[in-house]
């Protein structure tokens, strides 16, 4: 299920655009996640009180967390599948502390794809979308395997 060198290049090319505004992209990804899947909001004590999109857009904490999420994901993507060291602490915290189900990782992957489609249509055509989808699936599968090792049935 690995990606070719060309596919990784497509992923990292569009990711360069994301890194120009990690916090802004991250905020949009989280807002889209919470709008499309309101049940995910319950996992975030800090954001549970944010009921409207305007409240979410005005939240510095949401923007900071979006930056954290996409910064971590970028570090993983740049490893081109060789992300064991980066993944282990992330899986540990998401399985044992935050109890984030794998399904929610699918939901945020969808939100990432949607935000990239809307913000970077010229750099995120069908090939880049396919490559990013594969990269995010690889990430999710590896997270799920780590969850299993940790005894978390998320």
Curated annotation (Swiss-Prot):
User: What's in the GO CC field?
Assistant: extracellular exosome; sarcoplasm
* Source species: Ochotona princeps
On assembly, the entry states:
Monomeric.
Q: Where in the cell is it found?
A: Cytoplasm, Sarcoplasm
A single Pfam family it belongs to is: Globin
**E.C. numbers:** 1.7.-.-, 1.11.1.-
Q: Which family does it belong to?
A: Belongs to the globin family.
Q: Which UniProt keywords apply?
A: Cytoplasm, Heme, Iron, Metal-binding, Muscle protein, Oxidoreductase, Oxygen transport, Phosphoprotein, Transport
* Source taxonomy: Eukaryota, Metazoa, Chordata, Craniata, Vertebrata
Detail which positions bind heme b: 94
Q: What CDD domains does UniProt report for this protein, alphabetically?
A: Mb
List positions binding nitrite: 65
Function of the protein: Monomeric heme protein which primary function is to store oxygen and facilitate its diffusion within muscle tissues. Reversibly binds oxygen through a pentacoordinated heme iron and enables its timely and efficient release as needed during periods of heightened demand. Depending on the oxidative conditions of tissues and cells, and in addition to its ability to bind oxygen, it also has a nitrite reductase activity whereby it regulates the production of bioactive nitric oxide.
What does the record give as the reaction this protein catalyses? Fe(III)-heme b-[protein] + nitric oxide + H2O = Fe(II)-heme b-[protein] + nitrite + 2 H(+); H2O2 + AH2 = A + 2 H2O
- Where would I find the Globin domain in this sequence? 2-148
One GO process term, biological-process aspect:
removal of superoxide radicals
Q: What is this protein called?
A: Myoglobin
Q: Which InterPro entries match?
A: Globin, Globin-like_sf, Myoglobin
For this chain, one GO molecular function annotation is: oxygen carrier activity
Transferase found in the keyword field: no
User: Which residues are reported to carry the modification Phosphothreonine?
Assistant: 68
């Amino acid at each position: 299920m690995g990606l070719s060198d060309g596919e990784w290049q497509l992923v990292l090319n569009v990711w360069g655009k994301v890194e120009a505004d990690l916090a802004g992209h991250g905020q949009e990804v989280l807002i889209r996640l919470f709008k499309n899947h309101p049940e995910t909001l319950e996992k975030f004590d800090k954001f549970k009180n944010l009921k409207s999109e305007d409240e979410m857009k005005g939240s510095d904490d949401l923007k900071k967390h979006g930056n954290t999420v996409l910064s971590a994901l970028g570090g993983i993507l740049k490893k081109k599948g060789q992300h064991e060291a980066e993944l282990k602490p992330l899986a540990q915290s998401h399985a044992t502390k935050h109890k984030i189900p794998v399904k929610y990782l699918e939901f945020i992957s969808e939100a990432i794809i949607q935000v990239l489609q809307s913000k970077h249509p010229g750099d995120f055509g069908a090939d880049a979308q396919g490559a990013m989808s594969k990269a995010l699936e690889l990430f999710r599968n590896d997270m799920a395997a780590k969850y299993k090792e940790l005894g978390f049935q998320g």
